[in-house]
Amino acid sequence: MHSWIFIHFTVQSYKIIPGITPGITESETGSRRAGRLEKEKIRRAAVLVPLIQKGGEYHVVFEVRAGSLKTQPGEICFPGGAVERGETPKQAAVRETMEELLINRCQIRVIAPLDVLEAPGAMEISPFLGALQGYRWSYSEAEVDHTFSVPLRWFAEHEPERYETELVTVPEETFPFEDVPGGRDYHWRRGHYDVYFYRREEGIIWGMTAKILRSLAEMYREDILSK
């Protein structure tokens, strides 16, 4: 048992965790890095927030998803999708942007990663801020109905509407309630999740897209408009 512990949890050979081996300090342990439980259940996705220069200022490019798609047809979003096996979130964001906007890799400059979002349904979304060079409003008709742009400044000057949703736990029918204190009356924790809406003449920008925009707009407002 001791050999397993020092192989997995300590830096120095033949030493185990503090309290078991005399004289070991906490700084001498800790070679193991924390992983993530049930990571195989987490769906990973990545999106690119594409910027273009238009009229002397930055615009954000949006897609309207094709009506023929099974998921979220007609919704406004950023180019992006699932992170495939063997690729990084950044690579996924670039690949999806190339496929959906029909542009080349040399037309995309990834500027920086934005804050990762954890969405309901065990989904992790990695957004990246990027700049498009020579974009001519092309898109894949199989995935996109049309594209449009909105000045980034507009989002910095307009706060989105915020609505709160409640997340509840619903056990499956075969759940062994008899083994849980309180049975079917067990008090499950409830979560709360904010949903944002931007209302534009082009359509409603909401959900994860709006949440990413809100975060980007705050940075833009603090770094640019406040100066």
Please provide the spans of the model-predicted regions:
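N-terminal leader/linker segments that precede catalytic domains of diphosphate-processing enzymes
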Residues: 1-77, 82-127, 131-136, 153, ...
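Acidic, glycine-rich loop-and-strand cores that form catalytic or ligand-binding grooves
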Residues: 139-174
